[in-house]
Amino acid sequence: MALTKAEMSEYLFDKLGLSKRDAKELVELFFEEIRRALENGEQVKLSGFGNFDLRDKNQRPGRNPKTGEDIPITARRVVTFRPGQKLKSRVENAAPKEE
């Protein structure tokens, strides 16, 4: 199961007493600010959680898996996430979830 933005909004509604509309807007604005910073080439550091970084990848050779034809993979910029130490240790120490 995955945590969704709708579930985050519901949690803010339940725990902080925000209206559903305000909770949804808060979640949207939070992620929009992260997107804006990354679009502007900035690193995003969330203390106790982790860092979103931008990496430039060079063009490299690739292969079409259906035809086997060699094709170039174009140079591009990608977003990477590096979890912080607090997040890493919480995940490592969490009890495995039974399915």
From Swiss-Prot:
Any GO BP annotation: positive regulation of metabolic process
Gene Ontology terms, cellular component aspect? cytosol
Listed Pfam families: Bac_DNA_binding
Which keywords accompany this UniProt record?
DNA recombination, DNA-binding, Transcription, Transcription regulation, Translation regulation
Sorted alphabetically, which InterPro entries does this protein's record hold? Hist_DNA-bd, Histone-like_DNA-bd_CS, IHF-like_DNA-bd_dom_sf, IHF_alpha
* Function text: This protein is one of the two subunits of integration host factor, a specific DNA-binding protein that functions in genetic recombination as well as in transcriptional and translational control.
Q: How does it assemble?
A: Heterodimer of an alpha and a beta chain.
Q: What is this protein called?
A: Integration host factor subunit alpha
Please report the organism this UniProt entry assigns to the protein.
Salmonella arizonae (strain ATCC BAA-731 / CDC346-86 / RSK2980)
